[in-house]
Amino acid sequence: RPPRSTLFPYTTLFRSRKGRVGSVMSITDPNIFNEVQRIAVEDSRLGIPLINARDVIHGFKTIFPIPLGQAASFNPEIAETGARIAATEASAAGIRWTFAPMIDITHDPRWGRIAEGFGEDPLLVSQMGVAAIKGFQGSSLNHPTSIAACAKHFAGYGASEGGRDYNSTYITERQFRNLYLRPFEAAVNAGAATLMTAFNDNDGIPSSANPFLLKDVLRNEWNYRGTVVSDWASVSEMIRHGFCEDEKEAALKATNAGTDIEMVSETYIKHLPQLIKEGKVSMETIDNAVRNILRL
C-alpha cells in the first residue's frame, strides 16, 4: 500500500483519525477513499464511517442531457433511468451521496444555474425530481448501487433577484406554498435522504438560518427525518449577507435553525463547543442533528 501521505493530504488523514471529518467530497479513486475510510473506522475513537459525496447531476461516466433538456421530454422515466445508471457508476467509485436533483422553480433565464433544474412548472419539476430521486436511491439505500439523493436548494434559490446568483429573493408565504415548496414536499414524500439549503436570503433571512423553512415547514409540517446540509460555505456566507456579525454568530443561527451539516466552511467545528458551554446551543439540538446525520 502506498504511503498514506501520497494518497491524500496528511491533514485530512490526521483529522479523520481524530474524528474531525464526517464526510469527504469528490474522491473518485476508490483506493484513496478506502484508505480514508479505513482510518475513520479503525483508528478514530467512535469508528463512524465517512460518506463520499459528489455533484452527480446528469450522469457520472455516462453523460446524459442536462436536467432542463430532460424536462423538455415531459417524461419522468428518462430522469429515473439516467439517475439509476449514474448511481450504479458512481457507487462503483465509492460515491454514496449526490447533490442532486436540483428542484428549484426557475423563471429567469439570466440565472446561470437554470440548466441544472427542471424548469418553471411545479408539477413537472416535482415529477422529474421524484423520478431522479427514485433513480439515485433505488429500492433501498442499503443496496450497493444506490446513492443518497439531495433535493436542492431549499428554498427559493431560483427566484434570485435579477437572475444574479446568491442574490436576495422576496417571496411571500403564499408564493412559497403555491410554487416554490411544491417540488420539495414531493421530494420529502418520495423519501429524499437529504435536503440542501439555498444560498439566497428571503426578505433578509438566509435559507441556512431560516426557522420557518427548516423547522416550521420541513420538520413540523412535513415530518422530515432526513439530513439537512448547507450549500458550499453558505453558513459563513451569511456574514456577507449582513445577517451575521462573525462566524460564531453564523454557527449559532444555522444550528438553531436546523442546518445539520455545514459544508466546507468550519464555523461549526470552531465555535459549537463554546456555544454549547454558553448555553446558546442546547445538547438537544446537537443530538437531533447527530441523529439526522447518522440515519443517513
What do the PLM-derived regions correspond to, one by one?
Residues 1, 9-296:
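Glycoside hydrolase catalytic-domain context in secreted enzymes
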